[in-house]
Amino acid sequence: MSSQIDAVILAGGMARRMGGDDKGLVELNGEAMIKHTIDRIKPQVKEILINANRNQTRYAEFGFKVISDEHTGFLGPLAGMITAMGQTDADYLLVVPCDCPLLPTDLVPRMLAAIKAENAELAVASDGEYEQPVVLLLKPSLRDSMKAFLEAGERKVDFWYAKHHFVVESFADQPNAFVNVNTPEQKQRLAMEITK
């Protein structure tokens, strides 16, 4: 029996390094950043949720359910993940940021295979050098653990998953897969990469 997998795209942050611009809606080569992300993951999952804490109406125009953090105060990616885990009945939830337009087109199958091979609770992607703490495939049943962690004042995703049986899946074969946009300069470089 195949596993049902939903996804959440995290677009709930403050984007301080982008001058406060909503990163998911910043245009890259004529399309909103989040549209590139959607195009990459849509064939790999059943449902997509968009986690946004502002500009919800604009995000809804992409045709997917928009959810805002249950925990108020822009508490970071964990808050968005907790909210999404409470909104899905899938076996696994894929978590990705809104500003990674070159995500692997084989992200889900490889991460799922890694989980099953190790009988792990979650998989975290790596670029071959660094783990990508907001590119995860996890079981929604981990929600209570994550909620308790956040409510204890913790914010770091990697500190949370270190407490669980996790596996790292390397995408070193796709070196630009997790290049993201935090500054206008990075956006310019990425635009050139996409047009190659």
From Swiss-Prot:
Q: Does the keyword Cytoplasm apply?
A: yes
Localization, UniProt: Cytoplasm
Q: Does the keyword Transcription apply?
A: no
Q: Which CDD domains does the record associate with it? A: MobA
Give GO terms for biological process.
Answer: bis(molybdopterin guanine dinucleotide)molybdenum biosynthetic process
Q: What class of enzyme is it?
A: transferase
Q: Write out the catalysed reaction.
A: Mo-molybdopterin + GTP + H(+) = Mo-molybdopterin guanine dinucleotide + diphosphate
Task: Kindly list the positions annotated as binding Mg(2+).
Answer: 99
Which keywords does this Swiss-Prot/TrEMBL entry list?
Cytoplasm, GTP-binding, Magnesium, Metal-binding, Molybdenum cofactor biosynthesis, Nucleotide-binding, Transferase
Query: Where do the annotations place GTP binding?
Result: 10-12, 23, 51, 69, 99
- Where does this chain mainly localize? cytoplasm
Q: What is its EC number?
A: 2.7.7.77
Q: Which GO terms describe its cellular component?
A: cytoplasm
Q: Which Pfam families match?
A: NTP_transf_3
Q: Where is the signal peptide?
A: none
Q: Mind telling me which InterPro entries this protein's record contains? A: MobA-like_NTP_Trfase (IPR025877), Molybde_CF_guanTrfase (IPR013482), Nucleotide-diphossugar_trans (IPR029044)
Q: What Gene Ontology molecular-function terms does this entry list?
A: GTP binding; metal ion binding; molybdenum cofactor guanylyltransferase activity
Which cofactor is essential here? Answer: Mg(2+)
Superkingdom of source: Bacteria
The UniProt function text for this chain reads: Transfers a GMP moiety from GTP to Mo-molybdopterin (Mo-MPT) cofactor (Moco or molybdenum cofactor) to form Mo-molybdopterin guanine dinucleotide (Mo-MGD) cofactor.
Q: What does the UniProt entry state concerning the protein's domains?
A: The N-terminal domain determines nucleotide recognition and specific binding, while the C-terminal domain determines the specific binding to the target protein.
User: What quaternary arrangement does the UniProt entry report?
Assistant: Monomer.
The family database entries (NCBIfam families) matched by this protein are listed as: molyb_mobA (TIGR02665)
Similarity annotation? Belongs to the MobA family.
Protein name per its UniProtKB record: Molybdenum cofactor guanylyltransferase
Organism this protein belongs to = Shewanella baltica (strain OS185)
